[in-house]
Regions:
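Charge-dense, helix-prone N-terminal extensions
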Residues: 1-115
Length: 115
């Protein structure tokens, strides 16, 4: 998977906008950031809950690392070249779900929940 493929999927999620965030690019819904892209374009940071984070770390330790803000784990750093596209899409959808309005989430269930 590459950043352009991840970007296309993120932008397909209802209400998503891409905007700068310091030196990063960010994907937001309702003004809330659910994923960022570091300047290198080789990684994707997704802000998922602890359950999703630990599940992804167990399934794909070569592609996922804990993402920290200070001492707190806040999501995942995904090495895009090592990640399966279906997994990246699932994680992006999970991160979007945490920030999107409930009506949007109900109207757009994750088609890859088991990926």
């Amino acid at each position: 998977m590459n950043i352009e493929q991840a970007r296309l999927y993120a932008m397909s999620l209802p209400g998503t906008a891409e905007a700068p965030h310091h030196k990063y690019s960010s994907f937001r819904v309702g003004g809330k950031i659910y994923a960022t892209v570091p300047p290198d374009g080789l990684h994707l940071h997704v802000f998922v809950d602890e359950v999703e984070r630990e599940h992804a770390l167990a399934l794909a330790p070569e592609a996922c690392q804990k993402l920290f803000w200070g001492d707190a784990a806040v999501g995942l750093r995904i090495v895009l070249a090592k990640a399966k596209p279906a997994s990246v899409k699932r994680l992006l959808h999970c991160a979007w779900t945490r920030k999107a309005p409930k009506k949007s989430v109900a109207a757009h269930p994750n088609p890859m929940q088991q990926a």
